[in-house]
A protein has these predicted regions:
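A bilobed periplasmic-binding-protein/Venus flytrap-type ligand-binding module shared by bacterial periplasmic
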Residues: 2-3, 80-98
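Solvent-exposed loop/turn segments at secondary-structure junctions
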Residues: 6-8, 57-60, 94-96
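Extracytoplasmic/secreted proteins, especially bacterial periplasmic and envelope-associated proteins
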Residues: 11-15, 19, 39, 43, ...
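A ligand-binding cleft/hinge motif common to bilobed small-molecule-binding domains
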Residues: 50-71
Length: 142
């Protein structure tokens, strides 16, 4: 999921979906776009959507309940991957095996995604999902 008001996220989410579907076709990934930050917060907080792509400043605001999310409260999230100034966030209780599969896919395709950090750069990010770290280290799926 991305949001209209966090402008670069929706076009980039379409690139992510296309790349993921090439590596994990059974995922049947497709982009989703919320109309505003309130809707992002609602869908993510209620676990109707498990992944969200936000600019780093908005990702931090979602985690802290600040900035555009100050009226809605903080949300517990983990980082899955980073692309330039954007972070792909995941629900902490999203199945570990799914997080591992996504992280492993990004490990394989990061060079095809504009601005994507390398797995080595991702491994030192704060708040990284533990299963993503396992995938980047080459440790088998949990």
């Amino acid at each position: 999921m991305s949001t209209i008001v966090d402008e670069p996220t929706y076009p980039y989410s379409k690139k992510l979906v296309e790349a993921l579907n090439q590596v994990i076709p059974e995922a049947l990934a497709r982009p989703a776009r919320a109309k505003n930050f309130e809707r992002v917060h609602s869908l993510f907080k209620t676990k109707q959507l498990h992944l969200v792509l936000l600019s780093k400043s908005n990702a931090k605001a979602l985690l802290e309940g600040s900035g555009p999310f100050s009226d809605f409260g903080a949300v517990n999230v983990r980082t899955l991957y980073a692309f330039g100034d954007m972070l792909l966030l995941v629900q902490p209780d999203f199945p570990d095996s799914n997080v591992w599969l996504l992280a492993d896919a990004f490990k394989k395709i990061h060079s095809r995604l504009p601005g994507a950090l390398t797995p080595q750069q991702i491994m030192v990010l704060p708040n990284l999902h533990p299963s993503a770290l396992l995938a980047f280290r080459g440790i088998p799926i949990p």
